Amino acid sequence: DTETESEASGEDADKETEASKDLFAMDTYMTLTAYGEHAQEAVDKAAERVEALDALLSTGNENSEIYQLNQNGEATLSEEGGYLVERALELYKKTEGAFDIAIYPVMQAWGFPTQDYHVPDDDTLKEKLALADAFKVNYDKDTRKIFFFFFCMEIDLGGIAKGYTSSKVMDIFKENGISSAVISLGGNVQTLNGKPDGSDWRVAVENPADTGSYIGVLSIKDKAVITSGGYERYFKQDGKTYHHIIDPANGYPANNGLTSVTIVSDDGTLADGLSTSLFIMGPEKAQKYWKEHSDEFDTILVKDDGSILVSEGIADYFTSESDFTIIKK
């Protein structure tokens, strides 16, 4: 996960009203912090928005539109649900299937949504994997009608929901005249402008091999910083570790040479989706993907051997006690 080092000093806080709120939504702990005259009001509105989006997109809430869609195999989506499905299907194409919202039946076979973790048998996995292909999701963006080609298919927008939510929170902050803000949605960090004193926010990037320590710190303004790694959620069975980032190619936890991927972008939704996608791709494909889309995002890749790769767009803003290699276009 990425975490912010909160360094706004007391004198800055006097000039700017600070308001902060902690909440639990989307299966994670979140902290929203804003500075400005209407900070408290903005933070309260933002928290309401987060909870509304959670209720809309949750796969486990019987009243959510995604739950209903998964039950019925078809639906007319809300504007936001439709937008997210559209973005997800676009990412599916661009990442050549690495980002796949239809992987949900496979996630269930592993017990990740319910935390009833177990390694599925080969037959179950084969059966679920046959359903897991976003190519078989038919979505019409004009009518917002969606249907699945196979009855037992299910989707999960969890791979981009938090990134989208953080962008929406930023919109609320801007509408309420907030001059400076930082939010952490379960380690997804997004910032508005710099800190109240005008300096950069400093976002620490967690060490996947030793959570609680960091591989380095990013100095940023107005960016989303989102990290994915197998260390975030996993279980052990028969001495083996299985993490929650499933490779749609084989239905098993991705094991393609990376232990964590951090994405830095203006677009929270994109950053969220790509952090998972590049993790699944592995180091070579991930670097190639960045080179082809370097105008959209930057990245920090941590390989299985602990070596760190940083794309050149953020190399000057990343400080680390470890050596790192700069990925050039």
Q: Can you say where each PLM-predicted feature lies in the sequence?
A:
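Mature catalytic core of soluble alpha/beta enzymes
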Residues: 1-329
